[in-house]
Amino acid sequence: NINIKKDSSFAMLLEAQRRGYELHYMEMADLYLINGEARARTHTLSVEQNYDKWYDFTGEQDLPLADLDVILMRKDPPFDTEFIYATYILERAEEKGTLIVNKPQSLRDCNEKLFTAWFSELTPETLVTRNKAQLKAFWEKHGDIIMKPLDGMGGASIFRVKAGDPNLGVIAETLTELGSRYCMAQNYLPAIKDGDKRVLVVDGEPVPYCLARIPQGGETRGNLAAGGRGEARPLTESD
């Protein structure tokens, strides 16, 4: 499921191969525990910058995860119980000395949307709730808001609700599944027309360029998967 035109996983595969690493590919269903040992069924592969045929599987094996030097956890959301179980399996390999990127405990602790609550001074006004009345009050206060699920990706199920929109109720019911799931609401920031920014941090240091994702064609969403245009930009002082 890797899109080599935009997915950073492909760039990582190319660079790891260039540095002489043997590449192993595995999915969630390939991970398992046996008597406390983390193992996986893996495919070795080679990659190349070729849109028609960018990978070739070269072998298949079943091995302890502790035999691998580095594991890059690249699973996309949803952040569900299966995702959490996978981090526990990876943690067993981490205890044996394998470098897991990112750290399994951090993947569990730092939900990419909810974790913003730990630095709310840098975010729009944000409400996380499953209560429809609270969502309505937040909308009435701001008049123009963004509503989204906590476990989505790629711009899926993100709604902009303007003042007077008659769909607020059904959007709230859909996102919260009639009050049984949390969702997030934020006041709309017009600056999104200039793009949002993805800043990468490696070992605590920001990469000097960020990815700006710019909405296209009247869209609110800048996600590349939703048609946004990607643009590399140098970091500013405020970034």
Language-model regions: role of each:
Residues 3-128, 134:
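Conserved N-proximal alpha/beta basic substrate-recognition cap immediately N-terminal to
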Residues 101, 125, 146, 184-186:
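Short catalytic-loop micro-motif centered on adjacent basic/acidic residues
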Residues 17, 94, 139, 175-176:
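N-terminal cationic-hydrophobic initiation segments that often serve targeting/anchoring roles
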Residues 9, 132-133, 140-144, 151-239:
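Phosphate-binding site of ATP-dependent enzymes
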Residues 49, 149-151:
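Short acidic, glycine-rich loop/turn motifs
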Residues 29, 76, 104, 150, ...:
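Anionic group-transfer/hydrolysis microenvironments
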